[in-house]
From Swiss-Prot:
Name of the protein in its database record: ATP synthase subunit alpha
InterPro entries per the UniProt record, alphabetical: ATP_synth_asu-like_sf (IPR023366), ATP_synth_asu_C (IPR000793), ATP_synth_asu_C_sf (IPR038376), ATP_synth_F1_a_nt-bd_dom (IPR033732), ATP_synth_F1_asu (IPR005294), ATPase_a/bsu_AS (IPR020003), ATPase_F1/V1/A1_a/bsu_N (IPR004100), ATPase_F1/V1/A1_a/bsu_N_sf (IPR036121)
Record: residues binding ATP: 169-176
Classification lineage: Bacteria, Pseudomonadati, Myxococcota, Myxococcia, Myxococcales
Entry's localization field: Cell inner membrane
Length: 515
């Protein structure tokens, strides 16, 4: 075998030409201590606040504390396998999550990783968890209604696109039910929804996902789940991951709704994180910046100006109170940040008034700007009348001799309470709400004072349900005209009055029921 020098030199030249110097340089540190989801790391001198770092076992962490000789890192995953002395490296990336329509119909964790077993998510865009909220110039006042499908809310505590409306109440009063009904009602309205479950049982989240699937709402909804068994950092960052996903729709000329269920648990997770990071505690052991935690989150919900694309992100944060105490630290913080609150009361819930909305304490600071004209026409004085009824009902318990006007007000109020009762998972289109409320509050004829005046109180719920069925069958144009014109014109009033009169002639009250 002949060895040719020129052949060998040619091969060596090719090897030298194709040689690539593949050396990766990473700034590394060492774990000093680890426990309860927090690691202290020595050596990451160039680390940024909010930067992701990677531990030796592949688990990621988020830099929260920058101190003279170490950094405090929140571990975003299982910290049991991390040991003192392990190597940690910087990723030089600020924490971000995948966003886009690819996440619709999926259940993900706060890092955007799928939890539903449907395979990887093919999102092409990512967004940072923490970004600055839109400024004053970028915003527009809230003026479009976001229909919840719940009569008591759309009539008395209206929510607009871009608003922050707090849902507050004790446990087991129907807070999540109000939020889920609102999500279900967005079907066909081009509103994308994000449901953020913070510190909840996995079985509870599974039930919510199952209900959303059953009513066809998962096709436009993303569920961000941080379960009760997840580390505190995951529970703390879940709302920020959800709002980053919602901002994608807001900034791309679309409308989105985000539900935080619930921010009380996020505050508890943040308190745990802060105490483990040795930050000084304040009132109720919460750190001093817990107000800022919620304000910077909720300020990202906005209605953008026409120049910015006119998109919107509406937030429905949920807060759980203890024994109805709305003056506690976290409830008062969030009440002061939001544009109104829906207060759910235990006593009303157990009295069978569901949704258990306390109309006196609930308020929307956007008001009738977030209502269609037809709803303004029929529900204008409803809140005042209900408040008067509650006051009179309290006094009526002590006296039996009531004058006729008082008896009339009490009877009318009792019917109005019945009118506002609504089953779970039964959101109602706004035009049908208007038809029902018109029947109860019509003021065109002062002698009538409502078409259901002579209907027994116990039959009001059945009357409302059967009236809509009757109107759909015999007078379908009334609902169609209301939906298209969005106001009660003289023609619609005439047609609606005719439909109610015809129905009252055929309605059969329950035998023996009191009027």
């Amino acid at each position: 075998m002949e060895i040719r020098a020129d052949e060998i030199s040619r091969i060596i030249r090719e090897q030298i030409k194709d040689y690539g110097k593949k050396v990766t340089v990473a700034e590394t540190g060492t774990v000093l201590s680890v426990g309860d989801g927090i690691a202290r790391i020595y050596g990451l001198e160039g680390a940024l606040a909010g930067e992701l770092v990677e531990f030796a076992n592949g688990v990621q962490g988020l830099v929260l504390n920058l101190e003279e000789d170490n950094v405090g890192v929140a571990i975003m995953g299982d910290f049991q396998a991390i040991r003192e002395g392990d190597t940690v490296k910087r990723t030089q990336q600020i924490a971000s999550v995948p966003v886009g329509k690819e996440l619709l119909g999926r259940v993900v964790d706060p890092l955007g990783k799928p939890l539903d077993g449907k395979g990887p998510i093919a999102a092409t865009e990512t967004r940072r968890l923490e970004v600055k909220a839109p400024g004053i110039v970028s915003r527009k006042s809230v003026h479009e209604p976001l229909q919840t499908g719940i009569k008591a809310l759309d009539a008395l505590v209206p929510v607009g696109r871009g608003q922050r409306e707090l849902i507050i109440g004790d446990r087991q009063t129907g807070k999540t039910a109000v939020a889920i009904d609102t999500i279900i009602n967005q079907k066909g309205l081009n509103v994308y929804c994000i449901y953020v479950a913070i510190g909840q049982k996995q079985s509870t989240v599974a039930q919510v996902v199952e209900k959303l699937n059953r009513y066809g709402a998962m096709e436009y909804t993303t569920v961000v789940a941080s379960n009760a068994s997840d580390p505190a950092p995951m529970q703390f960052f879940a709302p920020y991951a959800g709002v980053a996903m919602g901002e994608y729709f807001r900034d791309n000329k679309m409308h989105a709704l985000i539900v935080y269920d619930d921010l009380s648990k996020q505050a508890v997770a943040y308190r745990q994180l802060s105490l483990l990071l040795r930050r000084p505690p304040g009132r109720e052991a919460y750190p001093g910046d817990v107000f800022y935690v919620h304000s910077r989150l909720l300020e990202r919900a906005a209605k953008l100006s026409d120049e910015e694309g006119a998109g919107s992100l509406t937030a429905l944060p949920i807060i759980e109170t203890q024994a109805g105490d709305v003056s506690a630290y976290i409830p008062t913080n969030v009440i002061s940040i939001t544009d109104g609150q829906i207060f759910l009361e235990t006593d009303l819930f157990f009295a069978g008034v569901r949704p258990a909305i306390n109309v006196g304490l609930s308020v929307s600071r956007v008001g009738s700007a977030a209502q269609i004209k037809a709803m303004k026409q029929v529900a204008g004085t409803m809140k005042l009348e209900l408040a008067q009824y509650r006051e009179l009902a309290a006094f009526a318990q002590f006296g039996s001799d009531l004058d006729k006007a008082t008896q009339e007000t009490l009877a009318r109020g009792a019917r109005m309470v019945e009118l506002l009762k609504q089953g779970q998972y039964e959101p109602m289109p706004v035009e049908k709400q208007v038809m029902q409320i018109y029947a109860a509050t019509n003021r065109d004829d002062p002698k009538k004072r409502g078409w259901i005046r002579d209907i027994p109180t116990a039959d009001v719920v059945r009357w409302m349900r059967e009236f809509l069925e009757f109107a759909d069958g015999k007078h379908p144009n009334v609902a169609k005209d209301l939906a298209s014109k969005r106001e009660l014109t003289a023609d619609i009033k005439t047609a609606l009055s005719k439909a109610i009169t015809e129905f009252n002639e055929v309605f059969q009250p329950t035998p023996g029921a009191k009027v």
